[in-house]
Amino acid sequence: MSINNLRNVAIIAHVDHGKTTLVDKLLQQSGTLDRKNMESERVMDSDDQEKERGITILAKNTSIEWKEHRINIVDTPGHADFGGEVERVLSMVDSVLLLVDAVDGPMPQTRFVTQKAFDQGLNPILVINKIDRPGARPDWVLDQVFDLFDRLGGNDDQLDFPVIYASALNGIAGLDEEDMADDMSPLMDLILEKVNPPEVNDEGPLQMQISALDYNSYVGVIGIGRITRGKIKPNEQVIVIDSGHSERKGKVLQVMGYNGLERVEVPEAQAGDIICITGIDKLNISDTLCNPEQIEALPPLSVDEPTVSMTFQVNNSPFAGREGKYISSRNLKERLEQELIHNVALRVEQGDSPDKFKVSGRGELHLSVLIENMRREDYELGVSKPEVIQKEVNGEIHEPYEQIVIDIEDQHQGSVMEEMGQRKADLKNMEPDGKGRIKLEFLAPSRGMIGFRSSFLTMTSGTGIMTSVFDHYGKAKDGELAKRQNGVLVSMAAVKTLAYSLFNLQERGRMFLGHGTDVYIGQIVGLHSRDNDLPVNPTKAKQLTNIRAAGTDENLILTPHIEHTLEQALEFVEDDELVEVTPASIRLRKK
């Protein structure tokens, strides 16, 4: 296939605006998917956690054959926490499809990824999706997107963008919202027409940059990237140059292209194509592969600095080793080193003792996805409260700030604004939609937002929507930020909890455990109704007497206890507390 028949595009969207569904429909209608995948939804999100959370974490590649052209499509994560993924992906493509919801319009994460695309000089194609939603307002959305591009400093070509309307769920698209085709073909035709073929030289010596890695126990490390010059064949000798400019020899075993979602071995790949290669050990992201006769490194890829850190430590609670398989500091260290290979935005440093590691990432979500993965792989660990990473600039302490958009019902506006004020947030904008809901935009220091999400859901009775995205590093705000108001109930005994004592403890606060659960000394068993910590005994049984009672036993009714998810537990703990994470349970304890 000649270069002129090749198109490389990335799909950008805010969380939940439907980009993974859109790719599904393109795959089905172009006839690229086989029968077994035809029925399943969101084929692209193949990771367990992606299916459960309904978000995309890892960037994926796929390709579609359409009218004798090949379109390589890369799906990117919308969360700013996975920004490390987004930047690498954009280095492989020539244009982006910006997907925006026809009701919500552009959201903060859309802005984050669009800024990255503009920095790379890519021209966008706007897809206004979910056009069939009640309350769709495509003209308003179009104006909003134009204003956004203008604010981000787009040039004339970027501001003169093509627009197409679609409903990915129904699998239809059209250049006019009133006149939709029966399928997605207008979108595919628009991509062929508006996206330039890759500007590369397929005659020169080989040059290719690795922009993503995968691992497979059968072939080892798999490098994914786009060939910028020349051709590559299996069993070819290459020189690998890493970001420190040191060179070593290597041999490529297999060369694989994409067909739909599957990787297929190809006899040769040429410049402009996105491919995977195997056979070279210890590949790193942003390594350059080149022909031994002409050694030239490509500029290294940049990734945003981490903003949040946590301490991972060996689980040293009395229950250590009961539920997990990997519990030693060596297991922990090896697992974190393995994660560093393909998780670019992660940093790991040795802590203040051999069994502690300081792990930094792009946000709470980024790190909690890693902890959840480790938990599923039978690891046990203790995790401290998330902290923001501060920097010193010209003798002043700077901290990360985030832009937050909150969508709530009018009646909750007062309590949310008061809480945000205590967390040192500045209100930037506010627009009521006239139907009983209001949209608030804040700029707030990240350390004030740790632990806000769970109280926000309680405040709005679960009806509020909140999205946040890293904005910049700015001068740190003075003064203490709002902390947890209540103390905790700490167990001072170690056996099974009993309903009799839990029933009597209910007057003191909300319990985190039910009847018949094993506890240990120092474990947090509930939330105190006052602001101090209280040692309690949840294992006390009723004293038996030898006098026969005539039905004087009271009927013990326990209020349902609070069960924390991993994210809620991380947000709940204070500086002197830990979250104990094991494959079977999540416990809170004092250090």
Please identify what each model-predicted range represents:
Residues 16, 22, 54, 73-75, ...:
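Residue-level signature of catalytic and energy-coupling elements of molecular machines
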Residues 123, 133-193:
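Canonical P-loop GTPase G-domain recognition
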Residues 86-100, 105-149:
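Conserved P-loop NTPase nucleotide-binding/switch module
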Residues 208, 215-220:
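A contiguous, basic/glycine-rich beta-loop/short-helix subdomain that forms a polymer-engagement track
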Residues 35, 107-108, 133-139, 171-176, ...:
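Switch/connector loops and helix/strand junctions flanking conserved nucleotide-binding motifs
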Residues 10-11, 127-135, 172, 176-180, ...:
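Conserved short loop/turn motifs at secondary-structure junctions
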Residues 162, 189-193, 197, 223-591:
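Accessory interaction regions appended to the cores of large information-processing enzymes
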Residues 1-100, 104, 144, 213-216:
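P-loop NTPase switch module centered on the Walker A-proximal segment
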